[in-house]
Regions:
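Amphipathic coiled-coil signaling helices used for dimeric signal transmission
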Residues: 1-22
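Short acidic helix/loop segment immediately C-terminal to the autophosphorylated histidine
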Residues: 49-55
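Short conserved segment of the HATPase_c
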Residues: 180-192
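Short helix-loop "hinge" at the ATP-lid/N-box region of the Bergerat-fold HATPase_c
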Residues: 148-149
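Conserved catalytic submotifs in the C-terminal HATPase_c
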Residues: 92-97, 114-115, 119-129
């Protein structure tokens, strides 16, 4: 009887795995089909924003542009996540300066911080080398910065810290925003999970899931510290090899 139970259980696991694969493939196929017409809509909306058109029409065009931009980002993240989960991405590991990469990512967010009146502090070494896929790691830093901006109120501060010793490098992105409950922390790396529904329109719940897959691909770790009303701190741990 026990043998039959084990066989039935294994069969159920296989079926659930097949359902998950079908669901992921469906998302991927639909995303590919939507990508091209969405790009056309986005490009035309951008052109309308630049044309000499009445102010009200420009406002409508801007709404279309921003909405299609968010959808494009969602589709890109779905496709990347699908490839990572299927292990269809082979990381191209090369040695590069991590501090230089972090500085470049931070500079890209300067206009956003200024617009939202958010302070930024950085505490890093002059240079530290790692061997990894730079393009994939850039996704991680951009997602962490994007999250920090999203949940930090005007007048708040975001802090970037990089430290290293003989065994590992630790990179932290910390904000003093709304923070998270313990329940949210448990699920924060799950696909499409959004703990704070008041910020639902600002993201799609895929950024941290995507970041985790990239880090797992490199055998890196990520830790989260957070308290409601006191902000959040994400720390990526990169072992030295």
């Amino acid at each position: 009887y026990l043998d039959v139970m084990i066989i039935d259980f294994n069969k159920m696991v296989e079926e659930l795995g097949s359902i998950e694969t079908l669901k992921t493939d469906f998302f991927s196929n639909v995303s590919h089909e939507i990508k091209t017409p969405l790009a056309i809509i986005q490009n035309n909306a951008e052109l309308l924003c630049m044309e000499k058109t009445p102010e009200k029409q420009k406002e409508y065009a801007e709404v279309i542009f921003q909405t299609t931009k968010r959808l494009s980002e969602l589709i890109s993240n779905i496709l990347k996540l699908n490839k990572l989960e299927k292990q269809a991405i082979t990381p191209v590991a090369e040695e590069y300066d991590l501090c230089g990469q972090l500085a470049e990512c931070a500079v890209n967010y300067e206009p956003v911080w200024e617009k939202k009146d958010i302070g930024f502090d950085a505490d890093m070494e002059d240079s530290v080398k790692i061997t990894a896929d730079a393009a994939l790691m850039e996704l991680v830093w951009n997602n962490l910065f994007s999250n920090a901006v999203k949940f930090t109120e005007p007048g708040g501060t975001i802090k970037l810290t990089e430290q290293s010793d003989d065994s590992e490098i630790r990179v932290s992105v910390e904000d003093n925003g709304c923070g998270m409950t313990e329940e949210t922390r448990k699920h924060i790396f799950e696909k499409f999970y959004q703990g704070d529904t008041s910020h639902a329109m600002a993201g799609n719940g895929l950024g941290l899931a995507l970041s985790l897959r990239v880090l797992q691909l490199n055998d890196y770790k990520i830790e989260v510290e957070s308290e409601p009303g006191r902000g959040s701190k994400f720390t990526v741990i990169i072992p030295k090899r």
